[in-house]
C-alpha cells in the first residue's frame, strides 16, 4: 500500500529542496464544488501530486479544494493536464501563477481534510455559497476604482492589509476571515446603495464573502477574479496601471510578493519603513511581525530582548521554559499589540 503522508523531517526536506537545481513554479488554485468523499479524494490526489514531486499545502472538504503548491517547471504542463482530468469540476480551472517567485515557497506536501476549505464560521443552513457576486477583470477593477459609487473591501487579515492594498480600500478590522464576515455586513449597512467590490489574495475568500453579502441583502456585489495575484498579472500583461499599492502577503516561505515599489508599512520595533514579515526566531514564540534589517541584526531575528536572550539559551533550557506555555496563533497587530501572547514574553513595542 502506498505511503500517503510524509515521513522525512522538515529540516531534511528543506535542505533537499534548496539543493535542487531545477526551477519550480508556485501555483495556487481553489474550486468550490461538491466532493462526496474528501478522504478518498485526498488520498488519490496525494499520490498524483507526489508522483510529480509537488510540494505545498492542500485542503479538501465536502465544499471543494484549496491549494498553494510548488511544481517543478518540467512538470507544470503534466500537472495541469492531470489535475484537469482528475474531476470534470476541475477541467479548465484557473491556476494562479505566483508573481514574485523564487521557486522556494514549499518543501513538503501536506494535504488535509477539513470541515471547510476556508474557515468561515457560517452555520446558516439557508446560505447558498454558489450565489456569488459578479467577477471583475483587471480593466474593470481599474474602472471601479475610479467610480465614486464603488467601495473596495479587503477580505484579508490585518497583517496582509498592512503591507499592501488597493487604493482607498476599506480594511475590515479582524484577525480571521470568520470574524470579518459579520463585521463586513455590519459596516456596510449604511452603504447598501453602493457598488461593493470584494477582494483577497487569490479569490477564495472574496468569492465566499460576496455570496455572504448577497445572502444578507446586498445586491450590488462584485469580486475580483483570481484576487490580487490574477489582477496584477493581467494588468501587467495588458499594459494597464497596477492600482494595488505595496506588497501582496502570501502564506508560504516567501511571505510576500512585490506588486509596487511603495513601502507602506513600518518595522514593528523601530518604525522604519519596512514591509518584510518574519517569525520570531525564538522557538518559544514564533510571533509573526514586521522587522527591518537593522532590528533583525540588533535582536538576532527575534521580536524582543527577552526572546533574543531566551533563544541564546541551551536547547534543553529553552525546552524547559516552553513547557506548559500556550501555543496560540501569535500575530502582532499594530493597533492592539501582540495577540495570544506567549506566557511571559512582552509585547515587542513595550
UniProtKB/Swiss-Prot annotation:
It comes from the Bacteria. Residues 146-240 form the Rhodanese domain. GO terms for biological process: tRNA modification. It catalyses: uridine(34) in tRNA + AH2 + O2 = 5-hydroxyuridine(34) in tRNA + A + H2O. Pfam families: Rhodanese (PF00581), Rhodanese_C (PF12368), UPF0176_N (PF17773). CDD domains: RHOD_YceA. InterPro entries: Rhodanese-like_dom, Rhodanese-like_dom_sf, Rhodanese_C, TrhO, TRHO_N. Keywords: Oxidoreductase, tRNA processing. The active site is at 200 (cysteine persulfide intermediate). Its EC number is 1.14.-.-. GO terms for molecular function: oxidoreductase activity, acting on paired donors, with incorporation or reduction of molecular oxygen. Catalyzes oxygen-dependent 5-hydroxyuridine (ho5U) modification at position 34 in tRNAs, the first step in 5-carboxymethoxyuridine (cmo5U) biosynthesis. May be part of an alternate pathway, which is able to bypass cmo5U biogenesis in a subset of tRNAs under aerobic conditions. PANTHER family: TRNA URIDINE(34) HYDROXYLASE, UPF0176 PROTEIN YCEA. Belongs to the TrhO family. This is tRNA uridine(34) hydroxylase. It comes from Escherichia coli O157:H7. The gene is trhO.
Amino acid at each position: 500500500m502506498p505511503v500517503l503522508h510524509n515521513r522525512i523531517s522538515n529540516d531534511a526536506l528543506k535542505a533537499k529542496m534548496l539543493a535542487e537545481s531545477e526551477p519550480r513554479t508556485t501555483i495556487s488554485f481553489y474550486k468550490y464544488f461538491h466532493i462526496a468523499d474528501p478522504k478518498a479524494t485526498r488520498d488519490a490526489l496525494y499520490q498524483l501530486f507526489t508522483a510529480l514531486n509537488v510540494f505545498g499545502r492542500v485542503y479538501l472538504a465536502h465544499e471543494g479544494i484549496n491549494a498553494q503548491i510548488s511544481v517543478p517547471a518540467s512538470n507544470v504542463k503534466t500537472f495541469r493536464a492531470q489535475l484537469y482530468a482528475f474531476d470534470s469540476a476541475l477541467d479548465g480551472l484557473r491556476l494562479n501563477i505566483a508573481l514574485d517567485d523564487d521557486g522556494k515557497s514549499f518543501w513538503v506536501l501536506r494535504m488535509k481534510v477539513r470541515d471547510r476549505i476556508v474557515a468561515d464560521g457560517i452555520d446558516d443552513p439557508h446560505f447558498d455559497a454558489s450565489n456569488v457576486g459578479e467577477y471583475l477583470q483587471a480593466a474593470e477593477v481599474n474602472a471601479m476604482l475610479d467610480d465614486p459609487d464603488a467601495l473596495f473591501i479587503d477580505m484579508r487579515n490585518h497583517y496582509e492589509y498592512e503591507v499592501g492594498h488597493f487604493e482607498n480600500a476599506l480594511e475590515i478590522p479582524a484577525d480571521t476571515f470568520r470574524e470579518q464576515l459579520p463585521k463586513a455586513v455590519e459596516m456596510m449597512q449604511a452603504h447598501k446603495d453602493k457598488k461593493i467590490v470584494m477582494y483577497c489574495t487569490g479569490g477564495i475568500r472574496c468569492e465566499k464573502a460576496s455570496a455572504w453579502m448577497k445572502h444578507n441583502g446586498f445586491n450590488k456585489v462584485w469580486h475580483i477574479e483570481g484576487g490580487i495575484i490574477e489582477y496584477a498579472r493581467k494588468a501587467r500583461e495588458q499594459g494597464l496601471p497596477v492600482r494595488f499599492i505595496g506588497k501582496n502577503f502570501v502564506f508560504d516561505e516567501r511571505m510576500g510578493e512585490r506588486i509596487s515599489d511603495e513601502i507602506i508599512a513600518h518595522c514593528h520595533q523601530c518604525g522604519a519603513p519596512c514591509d518584510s514579515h518574519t517569525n520570531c526566531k525564538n522557538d518559544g514564540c514564533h510571533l509573526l511581525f514586521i522587522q527591518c534589517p537593522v532590528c533583525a541584526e540588533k535582536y538576532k531575528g527575534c521580536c524582543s530582548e527577552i526572546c533574543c536572550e531566551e533563544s541564546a539559551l541551551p536547547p534543553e533550557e529553552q525546552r524547559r521554559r516552553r513547557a506548559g506555555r500556550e501555543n496560540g496563533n501569535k500575530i502582532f497587530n499594530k493597533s492592539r499589540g501582540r495577540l495570544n501572547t506567549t506566557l511571559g514574553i512582552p509585547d515587542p513595542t513595550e
